[in-house]
């Protein structure tokens, strides 16, 4: 899922190296923040960030999707250090995050719950049931980052199941909404660090580009699940070096 991974590189980097109260030596800390990768198919980038953050050896990345690997094709909590929830079936991440945020509130915990969800994923009705509950219970310890790259497996999101105007929908469901350029680190960090806990769940609509950073991948829906091969790998790496 190369295209899906590349749209969220900055999102995950900002979270793990600037925002989240998590650490490899505190995996069971009851006060740690929790991050959920709701768009579970985009796990390749997630593994890279976890490795760089020290949750497991970088060498493990060479075993991605191998038989009996610690790094399967979708997040599995029982296999990979740092993973909080098994995901991949779209529409499951937000309902679980709402439950975790509610539990934290009831136990007077200071932890926050973060998740990244794709815009195509928002066609799943379970997200909006969860959003209603989050607003009803005033879960201002919940931060939803919407990776809005406007593409999904079969084409443009607006043609498959249009969710625009997205900000208006989130606000109608009782969320505090902000927007940023999700592939621009400065814009993204400013949006996250500017969040306020004022009785409403927070939604950041991160406007991103699917396949960002690689010219022959970005903005093309066929790269939702394609993998570069041969000369494509060399070209992609060369372009990334220039970024």
Language-model region placement:
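Thiamine diphosphate
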Residues: 82, 86-196
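Cofactor-binding active-site loop characterized by glycine-rich and histidine/acidic residues
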Residues: 6-136
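General structural feature for long, well-ordered alpha-helical segments within catalytic domains
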Residues: 4-8, 31, 42, 57-60, ...
């Amino acid at each position: 899922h190369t295209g899906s991974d590349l749209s969220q590189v900055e999102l995950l980097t900002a979270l793990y190296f600037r925002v989240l109260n998590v650490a490899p030596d505190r995996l069971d800390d009851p006060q740690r923040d929790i991050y959920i990768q709701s768009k579970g198919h985009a796990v390749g980038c997630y593994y890279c960030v976890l490795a760089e953050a020290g949750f497991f050896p970088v060498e493990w990345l060479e075993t991605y999707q191998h038989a009996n690997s610690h790094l399967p094709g979708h997040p599995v909590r029982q296999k990979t250090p740092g993973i909080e929830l098994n995901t991949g079936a779209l529409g499951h991440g937000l309902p679980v995050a709402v439950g975790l945020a509610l539990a934290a509130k009831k136990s007077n915990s200071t932890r926050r719950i973060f998740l990244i969800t794709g815009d195509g994923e928002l066609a799943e009705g379970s997200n909006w049931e969860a959003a209603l509950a989050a607003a009803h219970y005033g879960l201002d310890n919940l931060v939803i980052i919407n990776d809005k790259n406007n593409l999904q497996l079969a084409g443009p999101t607006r043609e498959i199941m249009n969710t625009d105007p997205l900000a208006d929908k989130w606000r109608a469901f009782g969320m505090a909404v902000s927007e940023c350029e999700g592939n621009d680190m400065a814009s993204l960090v400013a949006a996250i660090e500017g969040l306020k806990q004022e009785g409403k769940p927070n939604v950041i609509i991160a406007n991103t580009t699917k396949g960002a950073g690689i010219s022959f991948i970005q903005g093309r829906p066929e790269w939702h699940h394609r993998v570069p091969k041969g000369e494509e790998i060399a070209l992609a790496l060369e372009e990334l070096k220039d970024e």
